Design a protein with these regions (language model features):
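Conserved N-terminal phosphate-binding loop of PLP-dependent enzymes in the Aspartate aminotransferase
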Residues: 1-273
Length: 273
C-alpha cells in the first residue's frame, strides 16, 4: 500500500511490546499491530514460551492432536454461536470454507458482501473489497475472471433498503450474507442502530445464512466478539491470526446442523494440514 500513501516501505529488524525497530535503527510505536492480531503486543513472553514448547514436540503432524480440541472448546465458550469449530491456516481459508459450506447447505449460489469490506484474497471475494485493493483504484484485482465473481452481489453497508432490493431481485438465489460486523478496511464504520438486527431478519426470512467475518473484531471489540457486543447470533463466524497470537492460523464455525454438512461427517469438502 506504500504506492497509495507514498514513502518507502520500512524493513523491520525486531519488535517488542508496543515497539518496532527498522533496519536503520529507527524506533516506532506500532499502532498497526500486524493489522490486528497482536493484541498482546510483540514478542509476548507467554506466547514465546508456548511456541517454544510446541516446537519441542514437532512442527506439523498431519493428524489430530489435543491442542486443536482445547482451542476449539475455548473458542466455542467465548463465542457461543460457534457450536462446532473447524481450524484453518488463515482467515482467507476460513471465509472461503464458510462460503462453500453456506452454498452447499442452502443449495444456492449467490452471496452478498458489502462494498469496501475485505474478506481475504479468494477470487470470488475480490469485488469492491477495500483494503489493499484500493491501491489499484479498481473494483477487482486483475487475474480474476468475471465468471468467478458473477455470483457475488455487492450491497452498501448501513443501507438496509439496498440489501432488501438485492434480495427482491435475486429471490431464492442467495446462500449467505458475509459481513464484517464493524468494517475496518474502509475506515472504521460502526453499524447504525438496528442494522445488524435487520440483516439477521432478512437472512431468516430468505433461508439464507449470516456469516460474521470476525477476523478483525473477534476478541477485540469485546472478548466475545461482535456477536456478544451487539447481541446478534450469526449462523457462521470466521476468525484469523488472533487465535494464534499472530501465527498463521484461522477458524470458522457455527450452527451444529450446518457444520455437520462439512466433511468427513457431511459431503461438503474442506481440508488442510
Amino acid at each position: 500500500s506504500f504506492k497509495a500513501v507514498s514513502g518507502n516501505p520500512r524493513y523491520i529488524k525486531k519488535a517488542y511490546g508496543a515497539y518496532i525497530e527498522d533496519e536503520d535503527n529507527n524506533k516506532y510505536i506500532d499502532y498497526i499491530s500486524s493489522f490486528g492480531p497482536l493484541i498482546l503486543g510483540h514478542a509476548n513472553l507467554e506466547i514465546k514460551n508456548a511456541a517454544k514448547d510446541a516446537l519441542e514436540k514437532g512442527t506439523t503432524y498431519g493428524a489430530c492432536h489435543k491442542g486443536e480440541i482445547k482451542i476449539a472448546k475455548l473458542i466455542s465458550k467465548l463465542m457461543p454461536s460457534m457450536e462446532m469449530v473447524r481450524l484453518t491456516n488463515s482467515g482467507t481459508e476460513a471465509t472461503m470454507s464458510a462460503i462453500r459450506l453456506a452454498r452447499g447447505f442452502t443449495n444456492k449460489d449467490k452471496i452478498v458482501k458489502f462494498e469496501g469490506c475485505y474478506h481475504g484474497h479468494a477470487d470470488h471475494l475480490l469485488v469492491s473489497a477495500g483494503s489493499g485493493l484500493s491501491t489499484f483504484g479498481e473494483p477487482s484485482s486483475p487475474g480474476v475472471p468475471k465468471d468467478f465473481t458473477k455470483h457475488t452481489l455487492v450491497a452498501e453497508y448501513n443501507n438496509i433498503k439496498n440489501v432488501e432490493e438485492i434480495f427482491n431481485k435475486h429471490k431464492n438465489k442467495i446462500a449467505a450474507i458475509i459481513m464484517e460486523p464493524v468494517p475496518a478496511n474502509m475506515g472504521l464504520i460502526y453499524p447504525k442502530e438496528g442494522f445488524l438486527k435487520k440483516i439477521r431478519k432478512i437472512c431468516d426470512e430468505n433461508n439464507c445464512l449470516l456469516i460474521f467475518d470476525e477476523v478483525i473484531t473477534g476478541f477485540r471489540l469485546c472478548l466475545g466478539g461482535a456477536e456478544s457486543f451487539y447481541g446478534i447470533k450469526p449462523d457462521l463466524s470466521c476468525i484469523g491470526k488472533i487465535i494464534g497470537g499472530g501465527f498463521p492460523v484461522g477458524a470458522f464455525g457455527g450452527r451444529k446442523d450446518v457444520m455437520e454438512k462439512m466433511s468427513p461427517s457431511g459431503d461438503i469438502y474442506q481440508a488442510g494440514t
